[in-house]
Amino acid sequence: MILYAAGAVLIAAVKWVVRIIGYLPKGVAAVFWLVFILPLPSQAHEFWIEPSSFQPDPGQSLTADLLIGTDFLGASAIYVPDQIETFALLGTGAKSQSERYEITGRYGDRPAGKMAAGSPGLRIIVHQTAPIRLIYSDAKKFDEFAREKGFDDALNQHQGRGLPLDKITERYQRYAKSLIAVGGPEKMGTGQDRHLGLAIEIVAEANPYQWPPLQSMPVRLYADGAPLANAQITVFTRHNPRHVETAKYQTDKDGRSNFALLAGRDYLVDSVILRPMDGAVESGDAMWESIWASLTFQVPSNQKM
C-alpha cells in the first residue's frame, strides 16, 4: 500500500512537471529541464524513446520524444546537443550499414527528435546520452535505486570499500532504442533488430510487427559487446495510459530472456548495470557507474491496410 501511494505521488509529480514545462517559453523550459529534470534519471527513473507513431507510412514526418519517468509515464526531454552522443534513424535490411539518418535539432526543441520515416521495413531509432554525474546525499536513496535494479548488495559493497555514506557519487549513461515498422501490409514484419555495439543494449530477436502477432518476445542483453548472463530486465506493458503492468525477468547463461506479448500493446524493456569504479577516491572520479539500456516497440492489434 505504501509503495502504491509513493508511486501515485511520483506519477502525479511527473504530470505536474509536464504541464509546467508546456506553459514555459522555450528558453525558460530548457533551463527548467536542466535544473529540475536531468538530476532525476539515476534515481530509478527509466529513459526511453517514444515515436509519434510506431507504424508510420513511408516518408511520413515523425517525431521522437525522449522520456524520463516511471511506469511508462514520463516527462519529455528537450533537445540538448551537449547531452547527446548519438541520435539516429537506422535501417535493418541488407543495406542497413548505409541506411543511417542523423537526427539533429535546435536547443530546446521538444519533442527532441524530428525525422522522415523513410522507406518500408523495420527501422531503429537509437539515442545515446553523454555521461552525467549525480551525487546521493542520502545512502537510503542509493540503496533503494540499487535494489530496484537488481543490485541488492551495492550498499554493502560501498561500505566494504570504506567509502562515505553522505556523499555517494555516480556517473551514468543511457542507451535507448525504439523499433518502428514503416509501410503497409506487404512490408509488415520484414526486417530484424540488430546488435549495434552499444555499451549496454537490448536486442529483439524477433520482429514484433510480424503478422499474425507474436505470442512472446525473445530478447538478448549485451554489455561491452558480449551477452550478459544473470541480469535483471524489467518489462513494462502499456495497455492504455492508465494501465501499465510491470514484470521482472533474469537473463539466462547466454544473455537471453523471453516474455509474453499481447496484441495492441506498447512495450518498454529496461535493464541497468551498476558497477563500482576502482580508484574513485584517489582520482576524484565517481564511486559508481551505471549504464542503462531500453527498448520500445508496439505489437499491432490488426494488420495495417
Q: Where does each model-flagged region fall?
A:
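Bacterial N-terminal signal peptides
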Residues: 26-39
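Sec/Tat signal peptide C-region and signal peptidase I cleavage site
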Residues: 40-44
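Beta-strand-rich domain onsets/edges
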Residues: 45-63, 153-217, 222-227, 239-242, ...
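Structural motif
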Residues: 71-78, 220-228
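Short, ordered, surface-exposed loop/turn motifs in non-cytosolic proteins
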Residues: 80-82, 226-237
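Short amphipathic beta-strand segments in non-cytosolic proteins
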Residues: 86-95, 232-248
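Glycine-centered loop-to-beta-strand initiation motif
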Residues: 109-113, 247-265
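Short acidic/polar inter-strand loop motif in beta-rich domains
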Residues: 130-138, 275-280
